[in-house]
Amino acid sequence: MAATVRCFGRVLIHHQRCSLATVTSQTSLYPCCIYVPVPNRHFAAAAKPAKKTKKGTKEKASNEKKDDIEKIKSYPFMEGEPEDDVYLKRLYPRQIYEVEKAVNLLKKFQVLDFTNPKQGVYLDLTLDMTLGKKKKVEPFASVLSLPYPFISEMSKVAVFTGNASEIKIAEENGAAFAGGTNLIQKILDDEIQADFYIAVPEIMPELNPLRKKLKTRFPKFNRNSVGRDIPKMLELFKTGLEIKVDEERENFLETKIATLDMPSDQIAANLQAVINEVCRQRPLNLGPFVVRAFLRSSTSEGLLLKIEPLLPKEGETKESDKKAV
């Protein structure tokens, strides 16, 4: 019995020495004037509760905004037209104007806003480019002669012809450049730059190197830029108005049709001429080509036009084509 007690005492003394050695090694790692023993922790610290976010309040605010918007949208339209010049647009359906009234309103806006009376009048058209069977109308460009021209500056026109007498006729009628294949390299090198390019039919096969360079300005029959009547073509392209579909928005066309100081009937006539030219680019039996039309000035908002009376009828176009022939 005494032997077992003696053995137990030795084990206890040895354990105390080992524990003292570990304590001294820990104190050497953290030198300080005051010794504070750090016990070994065998449990995880309790995590602090996360702060409550204001997600609920944000959702409530967004829901309230949605409710307000839905309430505004749910307001019924007022009957008739607004009696005053100042009114809430959401309470009335969008006004659709006849051309004459729209022009008069633009003139009235100019007086009230003290803007330039000679500012431009613009026509914005949204087009239906579908042809059926997954085909579309290609973006087009055209030049037309307006019934009441307003452009003061003449456009530069280059004439392609290999005939010396035709070159002389072109120069006498105001061509900026006239010549044959000798003009091709000069155009590729940007030595010659013109607003429009016209040609006689015989020289067309030799102009293929210019297709990529000129793009939509390359002479074509359907754009009236290829023909034999050089003086007539020069007159059209020097004084005519170019209209073309926007390159990015392929169903949108914007063009200047007049100045605001012109008489209302002249502005209306130019507008009708532009719409007739646009509608030539697509068969009428496929339905209306012009979907929406807005008339505006340089400083005013766009006024939605009543488009149905402006669209040409199929019988009218056939008669006009016969007269032209």
From Swiss-Prot:
Main location as per UniProt: mitochondrion
Keyword terms, alphabetized: Mitochondrion, Ribonucleoprotein, Ribosomal protein, Transit peptide
GO cellular component, one term: large ribosomal subunit
Pfam families listed in its UniProt record: Ribosomal_L1
Keyword Transport: no
GO biological process: translation
InterPro entries reported for this sequence: Ribosomal_uL1-like (IPR023674), Ribosomal_uL1/biogenesis (IPR028364), Ribosomal_uL1_3-a/b-sand (IPR016095), Ribosomal_uL1_mit (IPR005879)
Localisation per UniProt entry: Mitochondrion
UniProt-recorded Gene Ontology molecular function terms: RNA binding; structural constituent of ribosome
SUPFAM superfamilies attached to this UniProt entry: Ribosomal protein L1
Extent of Basic and acidic residues compositional bias: 56-66
Transit peptide (first-last residue): 1-50
Region (Disordered): 47-66
Domain of life of the organism encoding this protein: Eukaryota
The keyword Signal is annotated on this UniProt entry: no
NCBIfam families per record: rplA_mito
Family affiliation: Belongs to the universal ribosomal protein uL1 family.
Protein name: Large ribosomal subunit protein uL1m
Organism: Bos taurus (Bovine)
Gene: MRPL1
